[in-house]
Each structure stands twice: as C-alpha cells, then as structure tokens.
Amino acid sequence: MSFRTLSSLLPSPQNSEVSESSAFSRQSKENIKDTIILDKLRPENLPVASISDFVPLRQRDISLEAPFPSTSQINQTYVKTKAFLDSLLTKKSSLQLSSIANKDIVKREAISSVKSGTQRSVKVIEHKKDPLQPVTHRKRKVVVPSEEIQAPILHKSDDPSIKPTKEELDKWRIPSAISNWKNPNGFAISLDNRVAIESIKTDCPDNDKKDNFLLLSEALDEAEREARQRINIKQEAYKELEKEETLKKEQRLRHLAERARQDRENRRQYENEDHYVREMERNQRRRAERELERSNKMSTAEKLRRLAYQQGRDVSDKVVLNAAKATETPDLQYDSRLFKKAASSVASSSNQIFDHPLFNNSQIDNIYRPTTGSNLENEDIVDRLSNKKGRTGPVEFSAADDGKNAEQNEEDNEHAREYGLQVRKKPHTS
C-alpha cells in the first residue's frame, strides 16, 4: 500500500517551476476530472458524489499513519532555506550600508602652503537637511502648446510660364471695408471702390432672406401687440374686480355701522329710558340744592342786588344797605297857591308855574351823591353786612381750572358714587 504525504495533495505554488512529469500528471488528472465531471456535457452522466468523499482521511481510517520526512530530507531543506534567507539578508544589509556610507562620506583635501611648506587637511561635510522642509526650488507649470493648424507657406513657383489669369486674381482680391455711414478720418473714397462694394452686395442672393426677415419681424410685432392688448384687458378686469370688492366692503362696513348706530339709539331710547328720567330728576335736585346753598351763603346786600338785577332795576348801595335817609317833610296844612302871588313877584320869568322847588331840603341829593365824610361809615356798614374779612395769612392757592364748570364736576363726582348693589354702566360712545 503506497501512501502519499498531505503536502502532495495541495496545489503547487504559484511561481514555482513546473517540471514536465508534474505537468503531464497534472494534465492527465485534469483530463480525468474533466471526463468525470463533464462527460461530453451529457445530463444523464452527471457525477455522483457521496458524503464519504468529504470526510478527511484520518477520520476515514483511524489506523492511518502519516509518513514523516527523514533526517536527510530535513537537513537538505534546512540548508536550502538558510542559504536563501542569507542571500536576502545580505542584499538588504548591503543596500542599507551603501546608503549609510553615502551619507557619511567625508571629503578630505590636502592644502599646502607655499611659504611654510606644511600641509593641512580640510574636512568637507555635506550640510544636513530637514526631511520635512518643503522644496525650495520653484516648480513651474509646463504649458502644453496649443495644437493650432499652422498656416501653409506658399512659395513662389520658379516656373515663369505659370501665371494666374485675371479671373483667378479677381477671385482672390478682397476689397477694403468701406462703410456707407461712417468716415471718421474723412478719406475720399473713389467711385470704383464704391461700385465694387455694391456689386459684391448685389451678387449675394439676399432677396429671399430679406422677405423672410420682414415677415418674421411683422409676425413678432403683431404677436407683441396682441400680447400687450391681452395684458391690458386683464389689468382692466382686475381693476374692475378690485373696485367692486372695495365697494362691497365699504357698503358692508357702512351697513354694519348703521346697524350698530341704530342698536345704540334703540338701547338708549328703550333700555335706558328710566335711567335717563332718573338722571334728569337727580340733576334738577342737585341744581336746586346748589341754588339753595348759594343763596344761603350770599349776604343780604347781595340778595337784594341780585333781586333788583332779576327785576331789571338798578339800585344804589345806600338803598340796598338802608343807609339812605330821605328828607322828612311835614305834611303841609296850607295851600301853596296862597304864595303864588309873592312867588310870581320874585320870579324872574312870567312863565314860571311853581313858586318854590318841589323839595325845599337839598339833602335828598345825598341819596345818590354821598359826601366824602360818610364814605367810611358806609364802608363799615357794607363790610359788616357782607361778612367780609381781611386777609391775615398767606394766600390759599386753588387747583387749576380743567375747563369744566362746578356743576359738571359735581355731576361727575355723583356718577362716581355707588350705592348698594348698583353696577356702574359705561357711557355709550357713538
């Protein structure tokens, strides 16, 4: 029974040399496998594999012993491996040593002096460089030249017999560019050049193009005009819609305001009728109370003066203060006509009717023309009756007038008061 090693079952290395015998055996094996697997690609002869084919050899036969290599084979492989590794190490070490030697090269030169005749050695060492330092020399970008088609160089033919004809010269002649609209330098252009330019222009078949361009421009103008008309119509329609919407909004707001005003008036008329009546009665009572308080505070003279003013009469202070004393004339017990004759004799004029003045005493004039001596007495009487007192202390300043009357202030204070379970109502604002 012949045994094979486990390494023989493995495939050969990728870069190993293949001998003829091994190649032949491998080809034979591959052919056998191909015949087994493919068998001319017939489906009825498919390979049949069993589970025992996948079981290792050691598990198939426990008593199987693997043959170990002999000592001679081991020594031989050891020598080959060592020689190969030594060759690799020597190559690697030689490269490293050469790089180190190149780094540590020291250049020594002997310099001899002429005078002394002595020599001295100079040690030249390469300057150390930082490997991380960027490159100092400038790297220029190499520009690739553009691949332009070079103009052909036309040489004059040496053959004198070949001459261009007039037609060829006319074809190659390019007239100068002359504008019909601009001549800034003021050159005088000959008629020949003008005619040549016009002839070149007329030779070009531009009639069809011009007609087409005209049709295109007219169509574009018509389309633009129609588009503008449509836009204007849309804008007018939008404006009309906006006007209608604004009118509707205004009418709705006006209607709402009218309804609110009517509701407010109805509430004032119906809901607050009793409150309005009560307010009127309360105001009347307040006015009567204020009039009574004002009349109580007034002096007698002021009362009389006020009464006379209400009646349309003007009464002096003496009459008001009862200081005027009219002349008390006694009742005459005789007829004044008895003295008419004597009076008429004394009278300066014959037309005099009365023989003496109506009031003989002139004190009646003192009622309206008080004397200077009685002014002090009258002033004392007026001060006593009017309860006027002189100022003994500083002047009391009152609050600034807020533009409201006293009646309005009292009414506001009365509104601010709350009695019992009354609920203050906010005034309606229209």
Swiss-Prot record:
Residues 1-26 have a biased composition (Polar residues). Signal peptide: none annotated. One of its GO terms (biological process) is mRNA splicing, via spliceosome. It comes from the Eukaryota. Disulfide bonds: none annotated. Keywords: mRNA processing, mRNA splicing, Nucleus, Spliceosome. Belongs to the SNW family. This is Pre-mRNA-processing protein 45. Residues 1-28, 280-299, 370-430 are annotated as: Disordered. It is found in: Nucleus. The keyword Cell division does not apply. One of its GO terms (cellular component) is spliceosomal complex. The keyword Nucleus applies. Involved in pre-mRNA splicing. Associated with the spliceosome. The lineage of its organism: Eukaryota, Fungi, Dikarya, Ascomycota, Saccharomycotina. PANTHER family: NUCLEAR PROTEIN SKIP-RELATED (PTHR12096). It comes from Kluyveromyces lactis (strain ATCC 8585 / CBS 2359 / DSM 70799 / NBRC 1267 / NRRL Y-1140 / WM37) (Yeast).
